[in-house]
Amino acid sequence: MNISSMLSNDSNTASQDVGGNFDDSQRNNDKGGSQDANSKKMGTGEAEDHANGNASVEGNGIANHGSATNGNTKGTDDSSNVNIVESIIPKPIRPTRSSIESDEEDVGKNYNSIISNDSEHISQRYLENFEDKVNAINKIDQVLIKGNNMRVLNQEEENLNILIRNSGEIAENYIDRVVTEDISSKANILNGKDSVGKEFKWGSTRDMKKRELELEVDNASKADTAAKKGGNKSKQGATKSTPAKKAKAKPKRKPSATDDTSEESQLGKKRKTRAGSVSGASQNDEKSANGKVKLKLTLKDQAEEDSASADAASKVTTKEQKIITKQYDNTFVSIWKDLSRKDGPKVSRLMQQSTQAKMINLKKTSILAAREAKRWQLKNNRNQKDLTTKARRAMREMFNFWKRNERIERELRKKHEKEILDKAKKEEEERESKRQSRKLNFLITQTELYSHFIGKKIKTDEFEGTDSDPNANFKSANHHYDKYSNIDGEGKDFNSIDFDNEDEESLNKAAAVNAQIALEAAKTKAQAFDNDPLKNPDTNGEEMNFQNPTLLGDINISQPDLLKCTLKEYQVKGLNWLANLYEQGINGILADEMGLGKTVQSISVLAYLAETHNIWGPFLVVTPASTLHNWQQEISRFVPEFKVIPYWGNAKDRKVLRKFWDRKNFRYGKDAPFHVLVTSYQLVVADAAYFQKMKWQYMILDEAQAIKSSQSSRWKSLLSFSCRNRLLLTGTPIQNSMQELWALLHFIMPSLFDSHDEFSDWFSKDIESHAQSNTELNEQQLRRLHVILKPFMLRRIKKNVQSELGDKLEIDVFCDLTHRQKKYYQMLTSQISIMDLLDSANNSSDDSAQSLMNLVMQFRKVCNHPDLFERADVKSSFAFGRFAETSSFLRETNELEMSYSTENLIKYNMPRIVYEEILQPTFDNDVGSRKKINNMFNIYHPSNIANDELENFSWLRFVDQSPQEMNNLSKQNIIERAINNREYSDINYERINRLKYTYDEDNESFLPNSKLLLINELQNNHALISNSTYLKELYSIKKKVYEDMVINNMKPAAEPLVKAPPVAVVCDNISFVHDLQDSLFDPKIRSSLMPLPFNRELELLKSSIPITEYPKSNMLPNAINKFIDYSNIRMPSMNRFITESGKLSKLDELLVDLRQNDHRVLIYFQMTKMMDLMEEYLTYRQHKYIRLDGSSKLDDRRDLVHDWQTKPEIFVFLLSTRAGGLGINLTAADTVIFYDSDWNPTIDSQAMDRAHRLGQTRQVTVYRLLTRGTIEERMRDRAKQKEQVQQVVMEGKSAIANKEESGNKKKDVAFLLLGNDDSSAAALNDDSEEKQNLQDSKKSQAKNLEDMYHEGEGEFSGNVTPSL
C-alpha cells in the first residue's frame, strides 16, 4: 500500500520518501519476483538459511524484520533496520533502476563488475543521517498507529503484489538459469576443468542457485582471510563492503513493492500499542549486532573469490580466451533466440496483464484513499460548520428574544396610551354624538316646521282625506307646532348655533324662524319669476300684472271649463292640491298609484292656470319616448284650446320646431304659436342648451323614475332649467333605495333637501336595513319621515279611490326544468366556485362585474329556453342544380302553375350527327327496319293472337282481354299498366275531393259512352267494402297496425349530402328536344301521377261527372313513414321545441285555457331573442299576435296600441318590459303573463298596470312564470324585499317577517348563482366579521349588477332609443 495518504498531515517528507520507495519497488518487480519469494521463505527460518549459506544480506534484512515483529525468530542484524529505513526514506540516486538497465544491456558481464557499479551510487549522506532516519521511523510508527482503519486497503495491496510477483517468476527463473550456466562454465575453465557447466532443462534453477551460493560463501570466506592480512585496510574494506554486499545480493533478489508493503503491513499489525513498539525496537538492536558479523564474513569470502578469479584469469591464454568468448557469444545468441521465439511474447503479455491489473488496483486504492481523506476533512468541516450554525442560531434567538421583549414593552405602552386615548375619544364621541343628535333633531324639526306651515296652507290632509292608505299606522301629531306659526325673529346660521349650551325650546324657535324664512323665500322666488318683465318693449307693468295675477292664499277650485272631460272626486282634490302648490310656489310629487289618472290631473292644472290666471304657457312636458303620442293625443283631446308642439324627430325637424319659441318680443297668450311642448328625456338632454334659454311656467316630468340618479347628466340638465314650478309624476317614487327618493325631493326642493348624507343619516340606513334583515323599525322616525314628505307628495291607491276598478290577482306559476335544461344548468354551475364569485363580488372593476352579469344572463337563458344557446336548425342536402326564376310574382296570374324546371349544372353535349345518323331512322342505318322486324315478330301481335286464339291464347277470354288490348299491354311499361288498372270508388275519392260540397250534383246531363251500348250492367244490392269507411278499415287492419309500428316512427339513418337532378343531355336539334321531353315528361303519365289541377277539378264538378269517370291522378306512392318523404329538407320538430322548455310547456297549456275563455293576454319579456322564439311558437299554434319592443318606432307603437285596443281578434300582445311597460293604455287585456321577471319589481308593477288601470272593468290576473330551484326563484325574493322598502316609506307599513324568511338572509348575486347550498353557507358563516363584510359587498355588488343589467337602455323607454 502507498503510505503517502496516511502521512499527509504529519510528515510531508516522510510521505514523499515512502512514495518514492514504493515506485522503485514496483519497477524492480520484474527481476526480483523469484528472489522475493525465496527471501521470504528464508526469513521465516533464519537459522536454517544461514546454515546453508543461501541468504543474502539485503533480502534477509527485510524478511528478518518482518519475522522479528511477528515473534518467529530470535534476532537479526543491523541491516534489517537499514533496509526498513531505506524502504521508507527516499534515496538521492536510485541504484535499482540502473542495475536493471545494465543487466538488460549485457547479461554476460562480470558479476563483480555489476556489484561495483551499483556500489558507486550509494550515498554517503545516508550513513551520516542514520540517527535522523531512526527518529523518522519512530514518527512513522506513531502515524501507523492511527492507520489501523486502513488495514483492509493494505490487505488488498498485498494480494495485488503477490499476483504481480507470481506473474514475474517465469522470466526471473529463465534469466537466472542462463546466467548461472554461464558463470559455472567460466568457473570450470578458470579451474582447469573441461566441463562447460551442468546442463539444465527449462524450469526451476533451485539447484544451480544453491551451488552458486555455496561458491559465493567460499569466496567471501577467502576474501575475509585476505582482509585480515591487510590490517587497517581490512577494517576499511569491511566498512565499504556493506553496500557492496548489498549490491551483490540485488541480482539474486531485489526488494519489491510487495515485500515493502508486506513488511509495512506486518509492522502496522505489530505496532498496535506503544509498548509493542518499544519491545520491537529492542529486538532490532539485538539483531543489528548479529548482522555486522555476517557482513564481515561475506566480505572476506568475496575478497578470497576475487583473488582466486584473478589468479585463474592470468593463467588463461589468448586462444582460450577467444574460444571462451566465441562460446559465450554463441550461447548468448541461442539464449536470446530461444527467449525471443518462445518466452518473449508470453512474458510480454503477462507483464502487460500484470501492469494493467496493477494500475487498476492502484486507481482503486487512490480513490479509496481520497475518499477516506475527504471523509476526515468533511467531518472537520461539518463540525466547523455546525459550530458556526449554532453560533448564528444563538445570536438569532438572542436577537429575537430582545426584539420580542421590546415589542411586548412597546405594545404594553401603546395599549396603555390607547386606553387613555380611547377613554378620551369615547367621551368626545359621546359629546359629539349628543351634539350631532341635537343638530339632526334641529334639521328635522326645521323641516317638519317647514312642511307643517306648507301643509296648513295647501291642506294636503284634506285633499287626501279618506283616499289615503288605511294601513298607515300613524296620525299627524304636530299640533304643538302651531305655536310657532307667527313667530318673528332673525334667522340663524346653522353653523353659528351652539348646540352644546342651547336648550330645546330655543332650538325649536330658531328652527321655526328658519322655516318661516325659507317659506317666504320660496314664495318670493315665485313672485319674482312672475314679476320678471318680458323683453317686449311694448308691454308695461299693468299688462304684466294682468298676465300674472296676484297669488291667492287658500283656494278651493272646481273643474276648469277648458277641460273637456269629467274629473272624478279624488282627481278634483288632486287638482286643488296642485293649484295650492302653484300658489305657494312649491314643487310637488303626484305619486298616485298607476292607473288613477295622473296625466289628466296634470293637464287639468294647466287648464286651470290658462282659464283662471290667463297663464297659457309656456308649459314643458317631458315624458318617456313610448308615451309621447299618448300625451299629445290626450292634451289635444282634453284641452283642444292648447296648441301642442310634438318636439321629436331628426335634428332638421327639431330645428324647424324651435322657431316657435325662439322668437324675440314674444307674448304667451291664447293666440301664442304654442302653449305646451311635449318631448322625451333623451331629446331634452340633447338640446338642453336651447331649453335653458326659455323660462318655463310649469314643467311636468312624467315617469319621474327617469331622474332617480342624482349623478346622471339628465338629472343635472333638468335641474338647471328655469321653471316657476316643477311637478313630478310617478307611481313608484322608490324603486330600489332611499337615495332615489332623495333625488326626487332634492329636485323639487333643492334648498331643503340639499345633502344626501344627512337624509341618509335621518332615514335611509334604518329603513333599508329593516327591509333587508327584518330589524325593529323606529316608529317615531317613520312618523317624522311622513310628516316631512306629506306636504310635497300626494299619493292615493286604487282600491280606495276607484270602486268600479276590478281587482288584481297575482299568481306565481312554478315550472320545472326539463332534462336538457337541467344538463345546461348543471354544466354552468360546475364551472363556477364560491371563492371566484366572492372575489369578483369584492372586486370593483368593470370586468368582474361584467363576468358576473354574464353568468347571471346565462342562467336566465337556461330557465327561459335552451334554444337560446343553440337552435335546432333546418337540415337539408346540398341542392346541386339550377332553378327557375321569375322577375316578379305580381306579373303572374292567380293560378301559378310551377312546372318541372330544375336543371343539373352538368350538361352532356350530344353531337347532332349522332342523333341524326344513329338514333333517327335513315337510309344509312337499320333503326326503322329494326322497329318493323320487332313489330312483325312480336308474339302478341293481333294477327298472331287471332290465328292462335283457340290454342295458345285461349286464356284471353278468361281475363276479359281482346287481342288489341293484349298487344297494347305488351308495349306498355309497369307505370302505364298501373295507371290503366287504377279505379275510383265514391268513398275513396270523397276524402281528396276539395270541392265535394261546393256545387249541386243534381245535374245528370253527363252520359258515358258505355251507356250508349245495349248492354246493361249487373245491378245488385250487395254492399261494397271499398265504399264503406269503417268496413274497409276492419276488413284490412294493415294500415292501422302500421301506424303504431316502430318502422313508422323511425327517422332516416342517413341523409344524402348532395341532391341533383339527372345530367342534362343537350343536342342542337329540335326533334331531339321534343323526343327527350316526351320521354321524360310523358303528359299521360305525369297527369296520372300528379294531383288533379284545381281548374280541371272545378270543370269536372261543374259538369257533374261521376267520380268513377274522373281521369287518373294522384298516383304517387305514399312515403315509407311519417318521417321520410320525397324531400330531403328536415324541419325541426315544434312539439319538441315546446316540450324542451318548462316555461313554454306551461305557457302552452295556459294559453289554451285562456283562449277558450275569451281572455286577451299581454306577455312581457326581458330578452328580444326569446320574443323571436315566442313568435315561432304562436305561429305554429295559430294564435294571432302583435309585437312591441325597444326597436319599434314611435309611429309603429301608436298603431300597435290602437290595433290592440280596437281589434278583439288579436289574442296575444308580445311586449318588452322596458319598452311596453310605461305610459300606454292596454286595458283591452285582462291577463298579464311575465315570462321572465325584471330585476326591479317596480318595472313589473308598471307593466301589469298597463292593463289594471282606469277604464278596466274586468278582473286582471297576473301570471308570473318562475323556474323552481333556480336563480329566478331567488331573484323573486329580492324583488319582494324591494317592494317592502316601498311599502314602508310610501304607505307606512311595517314589515311583518315570516318565520321562514327571518332565518334566510337575502343573498347577493353570488348567492343567486350558487343557491343556498350548505357548502356556500358554511364558507361564509365562519365568523361574524367576515359575514358582515360579505353582506356589505353583496349590497354594493347587487347595485352594480342592476346598473349593468340595464346599461345602455333608455330610462323606462326600452332597450333601444326609438328613432324619431
Curated annotation (Swiss-Prot):
DBINO domain residues: 335-460
CDD domains xrefs: DEXQc_INO80, SF2_C_SNF
GO MF annotation: an example: histone binding
Keyword terms of this UniProt record: Activator, ATP-binding, Coiled coil, DNA damage, DNA repair, DNA-binding, Hydrolase, Nucleotide-binding, Nucleus, Transcription, Transcription regulation
Polar residues bias: start-end ranges: 1-18, 66-84
Motif (DEAQ box): 702-705
Record Pfam families: DBINO, Helicase_C, SNF2-rel_dom
Top class in the EC scheme: hydrolase
InterPro entries cross-referenced by the UniProt entry: DBINO (IPR020838), DEXQc_INO80 (IPR031047), Helicase_ATP-bd (IPR014001), Helicase_C-like (IPR001650), INO80/SWR1_helicase (IPR050520), P-loop_NTPase (IPR027417), SNF2-like_sf (IPR038718), SNF2/RAD54-like_C (IPR049730)
SMART domains assigned to the protein according to its UniProt record, in alphabetical order: DEXDc, HELICc
EC number: 3.6.4.-
Family that this chain belongs to: Belongs to the SNF2/RAD54 helicase family.
Entry remark concerning the domains of this protein: The DBINO region is involved in binding to DNA.
Oligomeric form and interacting partners: Component of the INO80 chromatin-remodeling complex.
Protein name: Chromatin-remodeling ATPase INO80
Species this chain originates from: Debaryomyces hansenii (strain ATCC 36239 / CBS 767 / BCRC 21394 / JCM 1990 / NBRC 0083 / IGC 2968) (Yeast)
